[in-house]
Regions:
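Hydrophobic alpha-helical hairpins/lids featuring a short glycine-rich hinge
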Residues: 65-135
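Transmembrane helical segments that form the transport core of multi-pass membrane transport proteins
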Residues: 252-350
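Alpha-helical membrane segments and immediately flanking helix-loop junctions
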Residues: 130-190, 319-414
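Juxtamembrane inter-helical linkers in multi-pass membrane proteins
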Residues: 123-157, 224-246, 293-297, 321, ...
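N-terminal alpha-helical transmembrane segments of multi-pass membrane transport
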Residues: 1-95, 245-248, 261, 265-275, ...
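Cytosolic juxtamembrane amphipathic/interface segments immediately preceding
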Residues: 19-20, 81-90, 129-130, 154-163, ...
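Long, contiguous bundles of hydrophobic transmembrane helices that form the permeation core
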Residues: 204-257
Length: 421
């Protein structure tokens, strides 16, 4: 039940960081929290909800089988299961088995947008949030879009209106981008060994969670002037000519994302190894040769992990993963977490096996784009659309990243409560 204390703590932190505490709309905040809790309960505690989630994750996972056809054509025997017979776990080549999934899923999502399926889903979910929470149509559409597309692409959904948004709406747009992950990378995380059903649940919990934290930290104090928003979805600039063009464009976007992910992982993992080597060398002088970045971050964030529901004896490890995600990115953190998920991987890496309880909580805590480098990504995208608001965006950047982080941690705390029942 420690997770209840964690939930209260996260809300208090958001209130403490609020720009206008007296203007907080408690109806909006309360309903957003209830929706986030209900999604968590539906996915993890209600038997029927677990069945639906399992079916949904099974459907998404089946896409991997179709993606494998393209992967096998490009890489031949290098993508064959026989690689595991020869190299053991070394037969899993990230660049072959995970990055191409991002390319395929990017193309698939683009096709769904072109034929109107994604637009219908976003309008349905976003419209429901708008009616229940009383938030503007822009905010509701953007946080819903963030479930499926990346933080750089989210503002493009409502590009003509970015310059006219109130400060609170703009902050909600930014928090929504930080709190979610793109649907195109879900299969990438799953390819590392992370449970797909938990990733899907975390994505849907991020929408109300983002609005919860955004409206606590930056309540609405102005009159929104964007309620006459047109159906931006389907009327976007540079819309694909036909379904083939949509598939090709999505594949190109997916390729850029895959190359970016691969480059970041190569650089960051190598830099972490270098930094850990230096820390170990320095720590050796003081009798701590095992000193690493993960260990330092783990001790700093262990209390937060504990409040989420992680047992204290695993809190340092969990805190290390959360710290990696904040300082570097979620892909690096998930790649590190993957070593702790199964007995075989843990034995090979020489690390302890995490309990299922902790695995679930950490999976939810990491499922978001909120990290320091993402601030630059968001500012670059938004200032390109609304350069006249550059200074305001810069002031909101760090606070929005914190809001996205609090949203992810709130999902983890809620899940921690339900799995402890």
């Amino acid at each position: 039940m420690i997770s209840l204390v964690g939930i209260a703590t996260l809300i208090l932190i958001a209130i403490a960081l609020s720009h206008q505490r007296r203007s907080i709309n408690w109806r909006t905040v309360s309903v957003a929290f209830v929706i986030q809790v209900l999604i968590g309960a539906f996915a993890l505690y209600v038997p029927w909800g677990q069945t639906v989630l399992a079916s949904l994750s099974g459907a998404v996972a089946s896409l991997q089988l179709y993606a494998n056809k393209g992967i096998e054509f490009l890489f031949g025997g290098l993508s064959s299961p026989h690689m595991f017979e020869v190299f053991g776990s070394g037969g899993f080549v990230f660049a072959i088995r995970v990055l191409p999934m991002i390319v395929f899923f990017g193309s698939f999502i683009s096709v769904l947008y072109y034929i109107g399926v994604m637009g219908w889903i976003i309008r349905l979910v976003g419209g429901t949030l708008r009616l229940l929470l009383g938030t503007s149509r822009i905010e509701s559409m953007v946080v819903t879009s963030a479930i499926f597309i990346g933080q750089s692409e989210v503002p493009l959904v409502v590009r003509p209106f970015i310059a006219k948004l109130t400060r609170s709406e703009l902050f909600a747009v930014m928090v929504g981008g930080f709190a979610a992950v793109a649907g195109s990378v879900l299969l990438g995380y799953a390819g590392l060994g992370v449970e797909l059903k938990y990733l899907i649940a975390a994505c849907f919990m991020s929408a109300p969670g983002a609005l919860l934290m955004a409206k606590l930290m930056e309540p609405e104090t102005e009159a929104a002037c964007t309620e006459q928003v047109v159906e931006a979805l389907g009327q976007a600039e540079n819309r694909p000519t036909n379904i083939i063009d949509a598939a090709a464009e999505g594949a190109q976007v997916g390729l850029r994302l895959a190359l970016s992910v691969g480059a970041m992982l190569l650089a960051f993992i190598a830099l972490i190894a270098l930094f850990n080597g230096l820390l170990g060398w320095a720590g050796n002088w003081f009798g701590y040769p095992q000193l690493t970045l993960q260990l330092v971050l783990g001790h700093v964030l262990a209390p937060i992990a504990f409040l989420l529901g992680v047992p204290w004896h695993e809190a340092v490890l969990a805190g290390g993963f959360i710290g990696e995600k904040l300082v570097l990115n979620e892909f690096v953190a998930y790649a590190d977490l993957a070593n702790y998920l199964t007995p075989a991987k843990a034995a090979e890496a020489g690390v302890p096996l995490l309990s299922v309880h902790t695995q679930v909580i950490v999976t939810f805590a990491l499922c978001g784009f909120a990290n320091l480098s993402s601030i630059a990504i968001q500012l670059g995208g938004l200032t390109g659309i609304a350069p006249q608001r550059r200074q305001e965006l810069a002031r909101l950047g760090l606070r929005a990243m914190i809001g996205g982080t609090l949203s992810n941690l709130m999902s983890a705390a809620i899940v921690g409560f339900f799995i402890s029942l």
